Amino acid sequence: MAEATDVVLVGGGIMSATLGVLLKELEPSWEITLIERLEDVALESSNAWNNAGTGHSALCELNYAPLGANGIIDPARALNIAEQFHVSRQFWATLVAEGKLEDNSFINAVPHMSLVMNEDHCSYLQKRYDAFKTQKLFENMEFSTDRNKISDWAPLMMRGRDENQPVAANYSAEGTDVDFGRLTRQMVKYLQGKGVKTEFNRHVEDIKRESDGAWVLKTADTRNPDGQLTLRTRFLFLGAGGGALTLLQKSGIPEGKGYGGFPVSGLFFRNSNPETAGQHNAKVYGQASVGAPPMSVPHLDTRNVDGKRHLMFGPYAGFRSNFLKQGSLMDLPLSIHMDNLYPMLCAGWANMPLTKYLLGELRKTKEERFASLLEYYPEANPDDWELITAGQRVQIIKKDSEKGGVLQFGTEIVAHADGSLAALLGASPGASTAVPLMIRLMHQCFPERAPSWEDRLKELVPGYGIKLNENPERADEIIAYTAKVLDI
């Protein structure tokens, strides 16, 4: 006998938690069930050590504003990401202010920096600063080529550096470090208190559509072969990180045809020595190597996890064919079907430089990887650093009418035409933009309900519907308020 519920959220990460809280705030009478394959929430990509924890607001990530062929830098994409992050930040602040989250310990003020180390990159960074400083959301950004000034911002990165090496840096004091695992756990605890059912150790075996339009999920208990649970729902969200593609394929919706995925592992060096970690307080992003994918931009980060400061450097690309860190090596081969084989082959052929880059990364020894760290922190001691494996990222491959198939970076919502099912595919900037992503998903799936949500959404997100960059006075007011509530 199937257990009926209004909403099923598959995946216990930041996306399901965010959507769950939004729906509970906007439709408090709806019954919601959250399913997670592991024994608790936030154990995969949302876990603090499985992502970089950057509050992606385009302050330091150079790949969000590349140099155009005409020599001009367009800040439009960076502004879009910054606006989205501020929507998330407002939502979190409201939940803290209303007592729906335990505290604001999930977010910390950590300056964001960009550091480059050759003349061409220094010239680019100057142009980027010139393009950004006129924008409201980037008005407090600083730029310098003065070694002493840069040393004040990031002393470890300048100590022992060749005096003749050109350097330039951007610095933004309003950057953040976010523990998305802690945030997810606080959100889910609130949901449980509101009657949301959480089912852990549940693997989705099958997804079927019934004649009346309801979705039926057959799930198995990963600890007990006889522990079957069947759920029947009118709305299904597939937010299982890298596992969402497999679930989307199981659903059989036509909108999911032609999608494929390519998994990339992330490796980082971690330093937990308090003496070293205490001397660096910034997230410092550099320039990606030629041919490298956007998620490979090197960065030396301050991380605040469970009240302790650490340093992380990376990422280094790795490859395993599983779509989740605790997934199966058969995930990739079993995801290849007739409808996505051609797009995947086309995307692979068109991205040979990326393939060569990944192969080169896989061949690197630990010593060769550490040499990259020395470029950013010249006096780093190998004994202080351990190499850790972060979460899996599954890059989207989708069919394209002109190219056959394209590799797409970022995140994408794939929804059934009638709004009864939606999946979230992709990676960065991901968690930082969870709130605007889930609001967009809700409007796409429940267009008839959207007008009745407007008033409450404006309470949850005070700047809802407003471009902060285009409304300076409102931006000052909202940014100051969220900074005060979140203590950042």
UniProtKB/Swiss-Prot annotation:
A single GO BP: tricarboxylic acid cycle
Assigned EC number: 1.1.5.4
Residue stretches spanning the membrane: none
Keyword Oxidoreductase: yes
Keyword Oxidoreductase: yes
Coiled-coil stretches noted in the UniProt entry, renumbered to this chain: none
Keywords attached to this entry: FAD, Flavoprotein, Oxidoreductase, Tricarboxylic acid cycle
Short name of one Pfam family: Mqo
Cofactor(s) it depends on: FAD
Catalysed reactions, semicolon-separated: (S)-malate + a quinone = a quinol + oxaloacetate
Pathway: Carbohydrate metabolism; tricarboxylic acid cycle; oxaloacetate from (S)-malate (quinone route): step 1/1
Gene Ontology MF terms in the entry: 2-hydroxyglutarate dehydrogenase activity; L-malate dehydrogenase (quinone) activity
PANTHER family registered for this protein in UniProt: L-2-HYDROXYGLUTARATE DEHYDROGENASE, MITOCHONDRIAL
UniProt record similarity statement: Belongs to the MQO family.
Protein name: Probable malate:quinone oxidoreductase
Organism: Neisseria meningitidis serogroup C (strain 053442)
Gene of this entry: mqo
